């Protein structure tokens, strides 16, 4: 598989996960979630600042919204001279939001989320509010509390409260999935996962994700994130070995998980598995990426006609996707093989 195509596919995941059609009926909003302010005196809990923001972002992705990724947010905050987790007054938050709207490139957010947390004698209180940047209007604070050991349930309840306040549609089945995934993962494994996904060093991130999988065997999101890191380095066999450890499809990356499996299978020269995984991804969410990967798999299996059909479906889904021309050239090479002198 060509390296350029693999890099294009992996880069596309930074924009957020693909979602079931039922979850994306309404136009998606774009959110910038700032690291939560740590109002507790225990600095060992600083990991929660970025961890809670990332986790809330995963929930919003699962609710069909767009979320600025951690790396882009870090660059934005550093450029604005704002330390991660620093408290922001409403006026400062609105000014930051205006900057994102004025940028020539990148995600232009229309919602800003401020958050804070406090831990006292084993109890945690978490609060967040949404600011509508275009209307310059702040919604009321939403807060939830509970035992620190039940952090994920508290965070899930906060996410659902924000969704209701924002009038985002969350199906009963989606809510049940949130409940199951938040109750199953031990707090220690969740902490390790948060430290991994909010880190900047890829080697350290991979080590932490492997550790999270040891602390909670089958941890779906840890397996997915580790697999994505390995795939970026084209370590296909290792990526396949870690992806198969996921005990279930990882929320909110269900479709992307199967797309990643398809990409890895192509890297391992296994078009049959790639075809199966791409079709699974498309059964969850129709996307240009899904049709392009399926087209790649069918091309590798020697079915040019079916690959061309998938190329047309990809164009219909998103004609601007940069991978379309890459696949078109590959199919043209098959039709008109270059002659060597």
Predicted regions and their residues:
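C-terminal/domain-edge helix-coil "capping" segments
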Residues: 22-29, 66, 96-99, 103-106, ...
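Canonical tetratricopeptide repeat
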Residues: 225, 260, 293, 326-330
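TPR alpha-solenoid repeat register
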Residues: 222, 255-257, 290, 323-324
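Short coil turns that delineate tetratricopeptide repeat
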Residues: 217, 251-253, 285-286, 319
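Short beta-strand->alpha-helix linker/helix-N-cap micro-motif
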Residues: 24-100, 106, 110-124, 137-141, ...
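Register position in tetratricopeptide repeats
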Residues: 232-233, 267, 300-301, 330-337
């Amino acid at each position: 598989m060509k390296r350029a195509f693999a890099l294009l596919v992996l880069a596309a995941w930074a924009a957020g996960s693909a979602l079931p059609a039922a979850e994306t009926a309404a136009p998606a909003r774009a959110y910038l979630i700032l690291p939560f302010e740590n109002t507790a005196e225990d600095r060992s809990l600083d990991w929660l600042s970025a961890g809670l923001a990332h986790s809330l972002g995963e929930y919003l992705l699962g609710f069909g919204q767009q979320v600025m990724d951690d790396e882009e947010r870090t660059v934005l905050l550093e450029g604005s001279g704002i330390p991660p987790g620093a408290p922001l007054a409403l006026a400062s938050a609105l000014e930051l939001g205006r900057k994102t709207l004025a940028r020539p490139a990148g995600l232009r957010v229309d919602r800003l989320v401020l958050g804070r947390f406090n831990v006292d004698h084993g109890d945690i209180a978490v609060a967040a509010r949404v600011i509508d940047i275009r209307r310059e209007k702040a919604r009321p604070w939403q807060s939830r509390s509970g035992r620190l050991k039940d952090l994920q349930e508290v965070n899930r309840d906060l996410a659902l409260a924000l969704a209701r306040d924002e009038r985002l549609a969350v199906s009963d089945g989606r809510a049940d999935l949130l409940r199951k995934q938040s109750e199953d993962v031990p707090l220690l494994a969740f902490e390790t996962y948060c430290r991994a996904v909010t880190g900047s060093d890829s080697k350290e991130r991979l080590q932490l994700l492997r550790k999270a999988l040891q602390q909670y065997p089958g941890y779906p999101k840890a397996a997915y994130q580790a697999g994505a890191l390995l795939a970026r380095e084209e370590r296909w066999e290792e990526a396949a070995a870690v992806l198969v450890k996921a005990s279930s499809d990882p929320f909110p990356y269900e479709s992307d998980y199967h797309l990643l499996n398809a990409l890895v299978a192509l890297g391992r020269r296994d078009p049959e598995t790639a075809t199966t995984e791409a079709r699974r991804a498309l059964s969850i969410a129709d996307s240009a990426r899904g049709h392009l990967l399926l087209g790649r798999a069918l091309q590798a299996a020697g079915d040019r006609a079916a690959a061309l059909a998938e190329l047309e479906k990809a164009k219909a889904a998103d004609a601007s996707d940069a991978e379309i021309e890459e696949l078109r050239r590959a199919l043209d090479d098959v039709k008109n093989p270059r002659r060597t002198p």
